């Protein structure tokens, strides 16, 4: 433990900030996990709702420096891609179950 009064104060402040940041970081991780859980369950509407709740929180904490801005962007990008892929997969499954074969349009050469 520090002997100087200002060093003691800084140690107390540092510990207080560490605990606060740990709880905020945990909250961000929880919101991200909720989106992944909704995606894995296959419920697109729940995934979109969870993503809409997660996005402003992850942006806010990236601006404040709690997580890196590139990490926030990476999570948003990956989750958006997975949510968008859910609709394509469900469309293919629906058409196959109806007996229709879905073919992507051919690109002109």
UniProtKB/Swiss-Prot annotation:
GO cellular component: cytosol; small ribosomal subunit
Gene: rpsT
Gene Ontology molecular-function annotations: small ribosomal subunit rRNA binding; structural constituent of ribosome
Keywords linked to the UniProt accession: Ribonucleoprotein, Ribosomal protein, RNA-binding, rRNA-binding
Role summary: Binds directly to 16S ribosomal RNA.
One Gene Ontology biological process: translation
Pfam families cross-referenced by the UniProt entry: Ribosomal_S20p
Transferase listed as a keyword: no
Region (Disordered): 1-26
Organism, scientific name: Hamiltonella defensa subsp. Acyrthosiphon pisum (strain 5AT)
PANTHER family per UniProt: 30S RIBOSOMAL PROTEIN S20, SMALL RIBOSOMAL SUBUNIT PROTEIN BS20C
Protein family (similarity comment): Belongs to the bacterial ribosomal protein bS20 family.
Gene3D superfamilies documented for this protein: Ribosomal protein S20 (1.20.58.110)
InterPro entries per the UniProt record, alphabetical: Ribosomal_bS20 (IPR002583), Ribosomal_bS20_sf (IPR036510)
Protein known as: Small ribosomal subunit protein bS20
Membrane-spanning intervals of the chain: none
């Amino acid at each position: 433990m520090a002997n100087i009064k200002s060093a003691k104060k800084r140690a107390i402040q540092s510990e207080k900030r560490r605990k606060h940041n740990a709880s905020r970081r945990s909250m961000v991780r929880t919101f991200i996990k909720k989106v992944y859980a909704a995606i894995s369950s296959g419920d697109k509407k729940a995934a979109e709702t969870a993503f809409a709740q997660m996005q402003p929180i992850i942006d806010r904490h990236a601006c404040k420096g709690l997580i890196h801005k590139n990490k926030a962007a990476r999570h948003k990008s990956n989750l958006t891609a997975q949510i968008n892929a859910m609709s394509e997969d469900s469309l293919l499954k629906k058409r196959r179950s109806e007996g229709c074969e879905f073919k992507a349009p051919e690109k002109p050469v």
